[in-house]
Amino acid sequence: MKRFQWVLLLAVLIIAGRAEIVQAAGNAEQTEDHAETAEQLAERTAASLETDKIGEFWNDIMTEYGGLLPESQKGSLMEFINGDKSFSPQEWLKALFSYLFHEVLANGKLLGTLILLTIFCVILQLLQNAFQQSTVSKVAYSIVYMVLIILALNSFHVAINYATEAIQTMTSFILALIPLLLALLASSGGAVSAAFFHPVILFLMNTSGLLIQNIVMPLIFLSAILSIVSTMTEQYKVTQLANLLRNIAIGALAVFLTIFLGVISVQGASAAVTDGITLRTAKFITGNFIPVLGRMFTDATDTVISASLLLKNTVGILGVAILICIAAFPAIKVLSLAFIYKLAAAILQPLGGGPVITCLDVISKSVIYIFAALAIVSLMFFLSLTVIITAGNLTMMMK
């Protein structure tokens, strides 16, 4: 009898163990099927996404700068979203360096003009000293110097146009990308985050554009003019006022960047935590208090959320890449102009100092400030997209 009890107990343990193994295998198969279903759903959803507006920006980049890229980095935006083609940072870095080299060579004519005008100014200045302040040489020197100033201001205006157009293009791209990104964020369980980001992003994007166009760029331009005027005479200097205006412009931009990042990061993180807790609570209640159907509903919801999260990360990463391309090429143009003026000042300084060399150095520094303003705005847009992408991932972590 006791032997029979031991045999019965052993049989029960074996059956229970086999049941656990079968159940574990079933769970593994269910998890694998769930992952495959989420991946298939993401591919099917990607095919129905409205990417026409974003695709226009991508096509513009391909049209203007596609000649610098290999064939592996060319193609439609949907090919990159579906995974048919992969984004290669190394190839794009090579393209950026090639474009920088091309811009420096293209500005070689400007460098030659600056060198010739500066040499003429130095020769005329020597003639003034030789002929005891001859009126003719003074007039000729003034004319050549004015031509140099006009050329410098024209280059400065071109740099401002490059930066302004790049900021406008980035703003338009963000406004086109945000609805798509927030829709995917909401479908992945981030309804509160999407409701928070939509008005805040729209307000801050438009405010940044107005700040750059109406305050920052005009102040930098006025500061450059005052600095150039200060080089014309030794008696009347306005360099302190020029420095003050420049500091106000950069300071206003830095303050706005701080406010922007503070609002986006702190409030965005709290909204993502709220989404995660809400989603977890709803899943627990549905799965435990509604028999059979509740568990099926939560599994289907997990599939949709996983697919939306996968698609959101893909679209977000491609959006960040396009944003970097929109900002990088104009920034290289601005940086090449600053390099040309700095190089001209460095080459010609051994011929003698004076207002001409100072003017070239002033223009170089002012163009660098334009580059800094463009870089700050680009960083602000880049971090805003990064926070939106991270908010969805944080929601899933909380769930």
From Swiss-Prot:
GO terms for cellular component: plasma membrane. It comes from the Bacteria. It comes from Bacillus subtilis (strain 168). GO terms for biological process: sporulation resulting in formation of a cellular spore. Keywords: Cell membrane, Membrane, Signal, Sporulation, Transmembrane, Transmembrane helix. Changing A24K: 10-fold reduction in sporulation efficiency. Sigma factor G (SigG) is not activated, signal sequence is not cleaved. Disulfide bonds: none annotated. Interacts with SpoIIIJ and YqjG. This is Stage III sporulation protein AE. It is a multi-pass membrane protein.
